[in-house]
Amino acid sequence: VKHFQERRKAKANAEPIAEEAVEGTDGISRNYRSEVLAILMKRPPAGFERLAQRILREAGFTQVTVTGQSGDGGIDGFGTLQVNPLVSFKVLFQCKRYAKSVAPTQVRDFRGAMAGRADKGIIITTGTFSAEARREASRDGAPPIELIDGDRLLEMLERLELGLKPVTTYEVAHQFFREFAA
């Protein structure tokens, strides 16, 4: 619990990702999911890769590094996931700021770039994955690739409270006050 409290404090002091969000006249953000996706689409590739790095670190990965190189074979970064004191996995990741679907050829190309370099791969996109790409990612006999589409990416930002701040709203419970009418 203390670990999560410390992480929450650090996040509160961190620079927000969604600082460009548009607010309604009452100060409440409207349709924040599409706003966040629009913000991410405007980020340069290196910025989106650094966001992926931050998400992976917050999710428990260690030694997360962005390669930041052209000619990297589609590998945007790597990290280590320590499952327990005895087992860890080297994981490579690729980032795609897409409004469209990621195709199965892109999953195959990423897997080819991974060959002999990691135990697992992750492709993170602002878009979606075609059904064929999903099948390719989990193909028998091939290293597994985790697919994180735009919806799942937003869920991770929400859960980790990165670039998003939860807001509590209150509704009047009239029934409660009625008992004090007389």
Segments (PLM) and residue ranges:
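Mixed-charge (Asp/Glu-Lys/Arg
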Residues: 1-182
